Swiss-Prot record:
Homodimer. A single tRNA molecule binds across the dimer. The lineage of its organism: Bacteria, Thermotogati, Deinococcota, Deinococci, Thermales. This is Serine--tRNA ligase. Catalyzes the attachment of serine to tRNA(Ser). Is also probably able to aminoacylate tRNA(Sec) with serine, to form the misacylated tRNA L-seryl-tRNA(Sec), which will be further converted into selenocysteinyl-tRNA(Sec). It comes from Thermus thermophilus (strain ATCC BAA-163 / DSM 7039 / HB27). The gene is serS. It is found in: Cytoplasm. HAMAP family: Ser_tRNA_synth_type1. It catalyses: tRNA(Ser) + L-serine + ATP = L-seryl-tRNA(Ser) + AMP + diphosphate + H(+); tRNA(Sec) + L-serine + ATP = L-seryl-tRNA(Sec) + AMP + diphosphate + H(+).
Length: 421
C-alpha cells in the first residue's frame, strides 16, 4: 500500500506508475472517493460535536426548551448513525482501491513489458558436451530417478523423486539453509499456509489470488513462498531500531495453482504445483541506502549459491510492466537450461520499500523516537525441483550419470549421482 498523503500530493507520479506497470485502476475515481470520505469524516465530526453540546444543555435547559433539545439530540444521533454507515461503506471501497495502487518503480527500471527486460550481467556460459546431451526428463527416466505413476495419484504437474535424486533434493535444501546461516540469516522452518490477511500484507492478494489454493472449510490458504508468513510475523509490532535489520531464511513447501499456464512446461520439473523453497527476507529501516545495501546482499547470496552449484547464469533488470505492483526494483536470476538453449528464471530479487509494510503494519521506532514503517526485501535462496533440472542437464556425463558439484559432495557423500537399482 502506498502513502495516501503522497498519493494526494503527487497524483501524477502514481498515474505514471499505473501506466508503466500496466495496472487497471482508475486513480481519479479513487481520489474522488477519498475526497468523499474526508467530507463524511468532517460532517460526522460536526454532528458529533453538536450532539455533545446539546446533551450538555439538556439537564440545565428550562422546560419549554428541553423537549426541542431532546428532539434535536435524537435527530443528530440518527444522522450520525447514517453518516457512520456511509463512512464505513466508502472507507471499505477506498481501502480495496488503495490495495491496488502500485509503488512507483525506481528510475533505473526499463519501461515496458517483458520484452523490455535487460540483461545486466552474465556468469559462465553454455556447457560444451562431447556427446549428444539429454534433457532432464530423459536423464531421470534413464536412471530411474522419478516415479511416473505419480500423475495417477496426484494429477498433472506433480513429481516424485527416487534414489540419489531424492537425496540430492534434500541435500540442496540443507545446503541452502546452511549457507544462509553462515551469512547471518536466521534459519526458520515455516507453515505452508496462512490467513488471508498475510496474503494481503505481501500483495499476493488481490493481484494474484488466482495462483493461490484455498483450504476448504477454513480461513487458510496455501503459500507459494515463505515470504507470506515471514512478512506477517511482526505485524502490529513496533520494533526497536537496534533490532534492524531482521534477516530471515525461511524454508517451507510451497504451492501454486499455475492458473493460466495451460500448455507451458508440461513435462518434467520446471513447473509443478508443489515445490520446496528457501526464501531470503529482510526487514530494514526506511532509507534507500539501507534498502540498496540489503538488495545487493540478497542478490550476492543467490549468485554465490549458483557459483557453488557451478551453474551458468545471468542477471536481468526487470522492466516496469513485468515487475509486480509493489516492486521498487526487481532483478531476476536466470540459469541456462541446455535442452531449451536458453536461460530460465530461478530467483527473483525484489525491493518493495514500505509498500508491504503499510499493508502488513510493520513498524519500528527510529533513533529520534518516531514510529515509522519499515522497508522490506526478498529473494529466493534456492527452489527445487526447478534447480534440479538445471543441475541434471548442465552436469550430465556421457554415461547418463550426473556429477555432483564440489560444494554438495559433503552432503551427498559421493561425487556422482548413481542410477536407481
Amino acid at each position: 500500500m502506498v502513502d495516501l498523503k503522497r498519493l494526494r500530493q503527487e497524483p501524477e507520479v502514481f498515474h505514471r506508475a499505473i501506466r508503466e506497470k500496466g495496472v487497471a485502476l482508475d486513480l481519479e475515481a479513487l481520489l474522488a472517493l477519498d475526497r468523499e470520505v474526508q467530507e463524511l469524516k468532517k460532517r460526522l465530526q460536526e454532528v458529533q460535536t453538536e450532539r455533545n453540546q446539546v446533551a450538555k444543555r439538556v439537564p440545565k435547559a428550562p422546560p419549554e426548551e428541553k423537549e426541542a433539545l431532546i428532539a434535536r439530540g435524537k435527530a443528530l444521533g440518527e444522522e450520525a448513525k447514517r453518516l457512520e454507515e456511509a463512512l464505513r461503506e466508502k472507507e471499505a471501497r477506498l481501502e480495496a482501491l488503495l490495495l491496488q495502487v502500485p509503488l512507483p518503480p525506481w528510475p533505473g527500471a526499463p519501461v515496458g513489458g517483458e520484452e523490455a527486460n535487460r540483461e545486466i550481467k552474465r556468469v559462465g556460459g553454455p556447457p560444451e558436451f562431447s556427446f549428444p546431451p539429454l534433457d532432464h526428463v530423459a536423464l531421470m527416466e534413464k536412471n530411474g530417478w522419478w516415479e511416473p505413476r505419480i500423475s495417477q495419484v496426484s494429477g498433472s504437474r506433480s513429481y516424485a523423486l527416487k534414489g540419489d535424486l531424492a537425496l540430492y533434493e534434500l541435500a540442496l535444501l540443507r545446503f541452502a539453509m546452511d549457507f544462509m546461516a553462515r551469512r547471518g540469516f536466521l534459519p526458520m522452518t515455516l507453515p505452508s499456509y496462512a490467513r488471508e490477511k498475510a496474503f494481503l500484507g505481501t500483495g499476493h492478494f488481490p493481484a494474484y489470488r488466482d495462483q493461490v489454493w484455498a483450504i476448504a472449510e477454513t480461513d487458510l490458504y496455501l503459500t507459494g513462498t515463505a515470504e507470506v508468513v515471514l512478512n506477517a510475523l511482526h505485524s502490529g509490532e513496533i520494533l526497536p531500531y537496534e533490532a534492524l535489520p531482521l534477516r530471515y531464511a525461511g524454508y517451507a513447501p510451497a504451492f501454486r495453482s499455475e492458473a493460466g499456464s495451460f500448455g507451458k512446461d508440461v513435462r518434467g520439473l520446471m513447473r509443478v504445483h508443489q515445490f520446496h523453497k528457501v526464501e531470503q527476507y529482510v526487514l530494514t529501516e526506511a532509507s534507500l541506502e539501507a534498502s540498496d545495501r540489503a538488495f545487493q546482499e540478497l542478490l550476492e547470496n543467490a549468485e554465490e549459491i549458483l557459483r557453488l552449484l557451478e551453474l551458468p547464469y545471468r542477471l536481468v533488470e526487470v522492466a516496469t510492466g513485468d515487475m509486480g505492483p509493489g516492486k521498487w526494483r526487481q532483478v531476476d536470476i536466470e540459469v541456462y537450461l541446455p535442452s531449451e538453449g536458453r536461460y530460465r528464471e530461478t530467483h527473483s530479487c525484489s525491493a518493495l520499500l514500505d509498500w508491504q509494510a503499510r499493508r502488513a503494519n510493520l513498524r519500528y521506532r527510529d533513533p529520534e523516537g518516531r514510529v515509522r514503517y519499515a522497508y522490506t526485501l526478498n529473494n529466493t535462496a534456492l527452489a527445487t525441483p526447478r534447480i534440479l533440472a538445471m543441475l541434471l542437464e548442465n552436469h550430465q556425463l556421457q554415461d547418463g550419470r550426473v556429477r555432483v558439484p564440489q560444494a554438495l559432495i559433503p552432503y551427498m557423500g559421493k561425487e556422482v549421482l548413481e542410477p536407481c537399482g
